[in-house]
Every structure is written in structure tokens, then in C-alpha cells.
């Protein structure tokens, strides 16, 4: 099989699948991306770059659409180059939303287009209107509706689509559900496994908590409201008041990965440190950690807090469960799909810092009582999210698409409508 992966980041969700396919000499794997860093053995990485930035005067509803078109054009030019070199894929697997697969059928009309569908934006009922203190105005609702334009184009054009969780699939229009399969990326329980009595010592950042008996952990890409960072910090203030020997370790970057920045340029970390009464000697910000140190953090955790709006479920929660953490998670739909309250984790009101602190205190007061919960958390991952079990299912999903195509294709099937030859050569920006 010849396969072309398309994702502006590298290797992102396609890391393990691309690695597995490339190990088999029967497959030729090419990865189109904007990220020049990193490599995967036997994967040919090819770079594309949009011809320009989004125009500053573009209507703000359409900026995401314009960005997707520019990225789609860049991939079109890359695909034409690959075609001229003799590479014609059987399957193109593109991450939807960014735009890389937008025009790929015009270059490779016979290729199967598979799309990874992570999220479909809704003004009501999921992330956007979740916070009652931050209501949406009419302008925001209209912008959210238009933001789905590139995703809708992919839903129409693709042969098959994949969503990592059932919750995420349910965000997409029901008329496209027949195209969508639920299959998670997978977590590696052979790497994320528990180790009793692990001490948290990270010399690179001068962190030594080998003396600490109570360590509360939190891991995130960005410190932001989407992942409950303000509520988490308010809970930390309460925990510190009640537990003078408890340390809190926060892995992640001081930025916003999802949602809005503060209007004055201040970060949420800065805001919470300024407004809350905290003992900073017992709060440790590690920044983004390499995987070995991140695993060490999870192994040393007495209680791990994971909060999210009704949005994309983070790998970090599943990695924490695989490592045997007691996870105190927000009682929101993506978390409830995995955690059963009181069995393999604990659920708590996203907006209630006092309840979060109370749940943490219970775990810290009686750690032995939660040993069975730690084991059930790991069992959940091993049974349902084990990378080694899921990867063959991903390969089978790709292959099934090819088998279905071979049964339905006709030698006289007309080519889909594409660009004129003039536009093919020019692709004006």
C-alpha cells in the first residue's frame, strides 16, 4: 500500500500508525507536513508551506476558511510534485479542519481519502456555551457555524472518517455518521505503567520531592479555562490551607492551547498566582516534560486532577490512568465515557473548586482505600485503549477502505470535477 499522511504538525496523531506501516516493506509511506523537526524511520517526510498568511482584512468569520484554503493549495502543489516523481498513493489520510486534504482528490482522484475528524464546532451543547459566566453573543455563534466549513468539505469529500471517541463522533452531523468509525489513537501501557514508591526527582529543573508524602499532579498542554486551570488553582489554594505538607506539581506550558487569551495579554497562570493566596514553595511548575520525566511525575502522583470542558479528550488523562493514578476528573461527557465514578476514578463538578479539593483530601487521607481504583483505572486502559491492540485495527480500517473501493470502482467511472488546467498550474493565492 502507498499511503500519504497529511498533517501540519509532525507526527501528531499519526505517529504510531506511520511507524508501524513504514516497518513493513510492502508499504511506501510519505508524510506531508509543515513541521521540519523530527523523523520516523522509513517514512519519507515532505514539507509544504502556504504561500502567505491570512489577509488581515479578511472577515473574521472566514479567517479559518482562508487559512484552510491556503494550506490546501500548498498541499496541492506538493501533491503535484509527488505525482511528477511517480508517487501516486492508494490512500491519503488527512487530519480534517486544517485544510491539507481539501484539494487532494483533484490530484489523486482514484486514491481513497480517509480523514481524522477530531472535532465539529457547536455553539450550543458542548464547549462553547459551557461556562455560564461567558455567554456567547450572536457574532460568536455565527463565527462558530462558519468555522466548520473546511470540516464539512472534508466530510463530503472523504471516503471514510475516524473519530477517537464516541463523544467526539456525536458532535458531527448525523447525516455523515455512516462514514465515521470510532477508534482511539491508543495509549502505550507498556510505557505508562505503575511503579510503587516512585520518588519525584528531576535534576534538569532542580526539582526534588523525594521527601514529599503527598503529591497532587496536573498535566496540560496549556494553562487555560478549557482544561479547568482556574478551577484547579482555586482548589489548590484550598488544599494548601488544609494540608500543610502537600505539594502540587503542574506539567504544561504557560499558554492557551484552546480557547481565548485574556484581553490584557496576561496569562492565566499569572492571573491565578496574583489573585490567590498560595504557598509558592509547594507549587512546582515543570513546563513541558520529556516522556520519561512525565511518566515519573505520574508514578509519583498521590492524586491526579484532570478537568475539561465538553471538548476533545486529552491523552494525558488516559496516560495517568494507565500509570495507575487516582484520577479526579470533571463530570463532563468526554470524561464520563471513560471514568465510572467510584470505580476506576472519581468525578467532580468542573465549576466547584471546593468539591475538587474535598475529593483530593479523601484520597490523600486514605490512600490504601484507593489501591483497587488505581488497578481498575489501568485495567480500563489495557482493555480498551491499548495501543498494541488498536494499531492493527487502524491498519484494518485503512485496508477495508481499499477493499471496498476495489469492489465498487468501475473502469469507466468518470473523474470527479476538478480545477481547469490553467488553475492547476497557477493556483493563485
Where are the language model's segments positioned?
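N-terminal subdomain of nucleotide-sugar transferases
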Residues: 1-46, 388, 419, 423-429
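Acceptor-binding helix/loop patch of EC 2.4 sugar-transfer enzymes
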Residues: 52-62, 110-150, 190-195, 199, ...
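Carbohydrate-associated surface elements
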Residues: 167, 186
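Conserved donor-binding/catalytic core segment of Leloir-type glycosyltransferases
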Residues: 203-227, 233-240, 249
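Nucleotide-activated donor-binding/catalytic signature segment of Leloir-type glycosyltransferases, i.e.
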Residues: 252-256, 261-288, 292
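Aromatic "clamp/platform" in nucleotide-sugar-dependent glycosyltransferases that forms part
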Residues: 309
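Short hydrophobic beta-strand element within catalytic cores of glycosyltransferases
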Residues: 326-329
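Conserved acidic donor-binding segment of nucleotide-sugar-dependent glycosyltransferases
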Residues: 341-342, 346-353, 362-367
